Curated annotation (Swiss-Prot):
Polar residues bias: start-end ranges: 281-290
SMART domains: LDLa
Residue ranges of domain LDL-receptor class A in the record: 11-48
Listed name of the protein: Low-density lipoprotein receptor class A domain-containing protein 4
Record family assignment: Belongs to the PMEPA1 family.
Single annotated GO MF: R-SMAD binding
Chain positions of motif PPxY motif 1: 180-183
Short motif (PPxY motif 2): ranges: 252-255
Primary subcellular site in the record, as a coarse category: membrane
Residue spans of biased composition, Basic and acidic residues class: 296-306
Sequence ranges on the Cytoplasmic membrane side: 86-306
Positions of the UniProt region annotated as Disordered: 100-127, 268-306
């Protein structure tokens, strides 16, 4: 044991390098370490380039700087990614919440500027041709079909739908006196005054006459019976609307009754010449039977009753 302790002491006391100034360096690591350990720089003069090593403190500082730079870059990238994701989800949520309100505003905006439902304030000017559109109560509050299919869809322009509705030609129906009343749709083309239109509609639903008396026969009846009767404006009128006193006292005669009194002759025989007026069939009221019986003009005398 004393020998081992002596050898260790001798190793520490042995001079590894002797400086020019006579100073002794006991550690070999102090030689050529780029530090002036001798004081006269004699320990760094004869060092080879291969054996020269930078001090370990330089490597440690560079390593720490690289680690710090890498950590800063990674943290910055992570923060940027998190901010982008939060912004994206915030915009998506806001747009999803605002879509129902936007659809409601667009539906409300169709009333004044979409022309899908006209307003109720349609002014009627007599004598002028105009189109009156009166929306029904059910259609005024009905959402269009293209909005009902996808309420959360983006708003599409209504120009194609409006143009399709405007380009449709108007339908003008002329009354012939026997047709049903016109269809009262949402849009009606009015070419007459309201009073004339109501009169035509009232006449169009009138019951058909029992039999037809043409205008020429009606004029002849009024001339010979002394009762004024205006000419008909239609193709025919009821026989009970005109008589000698302007009122019929009984139902009109049937075809068999008329042909039974005058077999071989036609009940409706038209002659428009004044030379054959005497041979034209005439009508006289029969108070006993309540019917009109025609007689020949040449056999008629004033005051004769059948």
């Amino acid at each position: 044991m004393p020998e081992a302790g002596f050898q260790a002491t001798n190793a520490f006391t042995e001079c590894k390098f002797t400086c020019t100034s006579g100073k002794c360096l006991y550690l070999g690591s102090l030689v050529c370490n780029q530090q002036n350990d001798c004081g006269d720089n004699s320990d760094e003069e004869n060092c080879l380039l291969v054996t020269e090593h930078p001090p370990p403190g330089i490597f440690n500082s560079e390593l720490e700087f690289a680690q710090i730079l890498i950590i800063v870059v990674v943290v910055t990238v992570m923060v940027v990614v998190v901010v982008c994701l939060l912004n994206h989800y915030k915009v998506s949520t806001r747009s999803f919440i605002n879509r129902p309100n936007q659809s409601q505003r667009q539906e409300d905006g169709l009333q004044p500027e979409g022309s899908l439902w006209p307003s109720d304030s349609s002014v009627q000017r007599p004598g002028a041709s105009e189109i009156m559109c009166a929306p029904r109560g059910r259609d005024r509050f009905t959402t269009p079909s293209f909005i009902q299919r996808d309420p959360f869809s983006r708003f599409q322009p209504t120009y194609p739908y409006v143009q399709h509705e405007i380009d449709l030609p108007p339908t003008i129906s002329l009354s012939d006196g026997e047709e049903p009343p016109p269809y009262q749709g949402p849009c009606t083309l009015q070419l007459r005054d309201p009073e004339q239109q109501m009169e035509l509609n009232r006449e169009s639903v009138r019951a058909p006459p029992n039999r037809t008396v043409f205008d020429s026969d009606l004029i002849d009846i009024s001339m010979y019976n002394g009762g004024p009767c205006p000419p008909s404006s239609h193709s025919g009128i009821s026989a009970a609307t005109c008589s000698s006193n302007g009122r019929m006292e009984g139902p009109p005669p049937t075809y068999s009754e008329v042909m039974g009194h005058y077999p071989g002759t036609s009940f409706f025989h038209h002659q428009h010449s004044n030379t054959h007026r005497g041979s034209r069939p005439q009508f006289q009221p029969n108070n006993s039977e309540g019917t009109i019986v025609p007689i020949k003009g040449k056999d008629r005398k004033p005051g004769d009753l059948v």
